[in-house]
């Protein structure tokens, strides 16, 4: 059984509240879970201590026993110092697309040609 530490949504319409739960990876988001491990209230201020509440001892126990936290939960655990989150590095994502690179090269070529023509005209 693959276990995930993930968020289960609660609260009412446009007033989200999430429980940090341990659940089988195949169960629905708000479905059956094995243990409630904390909560997250995104409506509270970011510096409020009640915004994210975690049971660090139980979370460590379940991670040692093979449970995988989701990306969002891993961010909370990293902030709390419970688990380490590796920073994602994708330098290719920052590059413009192929056609944009071609257009930039054409524009640079036009600028270079114009500068050369201006230099010839000045002589």
Swiss-Prot record:
Indicate yes or no for the key word Ribonucleoprotein.
yes
According to its record, what are the GO cellular component terms?
cytoplasm; small ribosomal subunit
Query: For bias kind Basic and acidic residues, which ranges apply?
Result: 99-110
Recorded hits in SUPFAM superfamilies, A to Z, give: Ribosomal protein S16 (SSF54565)
Q: Where do the segments described as Disordered lie?
A: 85-123
Task: Tell me where on the tree of life, at the top rank, the source sits.
Answer: Bacteria
Carries keyword Ribonucleoprotein?
yes
Q: GO biological process: what's one of them?
A: translation
Biased segments, Low complexity type: 111-123
Cite the entry's keywords alphabetically. Ribonucleoprotein, Ribosomal protein
Q: What is this protein called?
A: Small ribosomal subunit protein bS16
Q: Native species of this protein?
A: Rhizobium leguminosarum bv. trifolii (strain WSM2304)
Protein encoded by which gene: rpsP
């Amino acid at each position: 059984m693959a276990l995930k530490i993930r968020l289960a949504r609660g609260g009412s319409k446009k007033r989200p509240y999430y429980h940090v739960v341990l659940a089988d990876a195949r169960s629905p988001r708000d479905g059956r879970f094995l243990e409630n491990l904390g909560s997250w209230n995104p409506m509270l201020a970011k510096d409020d201590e009640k915004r994210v509440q975690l049971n660090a001892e139980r979370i460590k126990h379940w991670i040692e026993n093979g449970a995988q936290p989701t990306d969002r939960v891993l961010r909370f655990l990293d902030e709390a110092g419970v688990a380490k989150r590796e920073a994602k590095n994708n330098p290719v994502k920052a590059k413009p697309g192929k056609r944009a690179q071609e257009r930039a090269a054409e524009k640079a070529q036009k600028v270079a040609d114009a500068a050369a023509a201006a230099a010839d005209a000045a002589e």
